[in-house]
Amino acid sequence: MVGDEELAGLSRGERIELLRSRMGAPKLSTTSILQAPPELGQLLPQGGLARQAVTEIADCPALIVELISHTTAAGGHVGVVGWPELSLAGVSEQGNLDRVIVVPDPGVDPLGVAAVLVEGLDLVIVRSTGQLSPVRARPLLAKLRGGSAALVFVGVQIASPAARIGATVSTFRGIGPGRGRIQGLDIHVHVAAKGHRPMQGTMTVGRRAELRAV
């Protein structure tokens, strides 16, 4: 895993070269879909996230960690840009942290960092705020089309993404009256994908993973 300690003090060019050097592993697949966890895949067209395309996902860390765990456990490589407080402890339990590149502080050009990562990884997650105009998005999307990554924006709005996924934690599992510890989470998920009717369901991560489609 690449973190702040390796990027500290490096110029933008040096950061890019370091990131490029860590992307020599083969991609998970050349198919057009990055398979999602089965319980989420039931709601998504063809069971996963579109490669060479953008998906917007709500700011739900538990769902993002589940995506990272599933992708790395299947042999894929993941990049996370601009999310220093995201805990990857769950990935070490179910996935493979050695297949994760983390750039907590991408500096003034997070899209430039993401553009490097989408050329060689399977899943790239960018967390920021605001709306991304077509002009600003164009260079990144050009790089995305040249690779095979699925690009996920968290907290960023972009015109016409392949899918928008809303996610809200609805239940904490394992906690009784005044005691216990969290062993799992129920997440209500809503998916709106191009060319498909909206889908929603409740996904449990942690102790038990299942989906009750609505």
Model-derived regions, located:
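Glycine-rich, charge-decorated loop segments at or immediately adjacent to ligand/cofactor-binding or catalytic sites
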Residues: 88-92, 157-171
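Long, charge-dense
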Residues: 77-141
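Detector for small/aliphatic-rich hydrophobic stretches
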Residues: 1-80, 194, 214
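Short, charged, surface-exposed secondary-structure boundary motifs
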Residues: 110-114, 162-163, 177
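Hydrophobic/aromatic beta-strand patches that form the interior of the parallel beta-sheet core
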Residues: 55, 79, 101-103, 152, ...
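Long, charge-dense, solvent-exposed interaction surfaces that engage phosphate-rich ligands
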Residues: 132-136, 141-143, 148-163
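Short glycine-/polar-rich loops that comprise or flank the Walker A/P-loop
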Residues: 76, 97, 120-121, 147-150, ...
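C-terminal functional extensions of proteins
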Residues: 169-214
